[in-house]
């Protein structure tokens, strides 16, 4: 599991909110190098299976983190939702991965919030609670084989 935590910036100083990104399902990364297996067609099949699993898990992680942040920070900051993109930080992770943008440093109100220790603790608790929800879901479904 790979979680990259950032703060956002925009030319529009009114841009606001937190958001969670996952890798676009259409992007296919190579998890298993074809040169490490005898049967190259097997590597293709395994890569496809792993990518499908990683995408499913990444979407769920993004959902649960977004919900965790919403529960603790939604009164003070806009939830921009979960989104997909081929960001470098998630594209090159050979595991389930998400990018969490905690707010906009170019927005005066949010920049001030993100310098407040109590608010930062709320945000970290929101992320933590989302991860607990994901792990609980994962363990109940035994690795999503039941999906």
Tell what function each PLM region has:
Residues 1-147:
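Active-site-proximal helix/loop segments of hydrolytic enzymes
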């Amino acid at each position: 599991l790979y979680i990259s935590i950032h703060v956002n910036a925009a030319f529009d100083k009114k841009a606001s909110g937190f958001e969670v990104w996952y890798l676009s399902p259409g992007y296919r990364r190579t998890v298993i190098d074809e040169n490490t297996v005898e049967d190259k067609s097997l590597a293709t099949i395994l890569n496809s299976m792993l990518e499908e699993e990683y995408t499913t898990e990444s979407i769920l992680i993004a959902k649960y983190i977004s919900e965790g942040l919403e529960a603790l920070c939604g009164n003070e900051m806009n939830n921009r939702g979960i989104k997909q993109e081929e960001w470098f930080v998630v594209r090159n992770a050979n595991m389930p991965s998400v990018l969490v943008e905690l707010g906009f440093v170019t927005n005066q109100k949010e920049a001030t919030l993100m310098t407040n220790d109590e608010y930062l603790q709320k945000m970290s608790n929101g992320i933590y609670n989302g991860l607990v929800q994901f792990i609980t879901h994962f363990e109940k479904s035994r690795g999503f084989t039941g999906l």
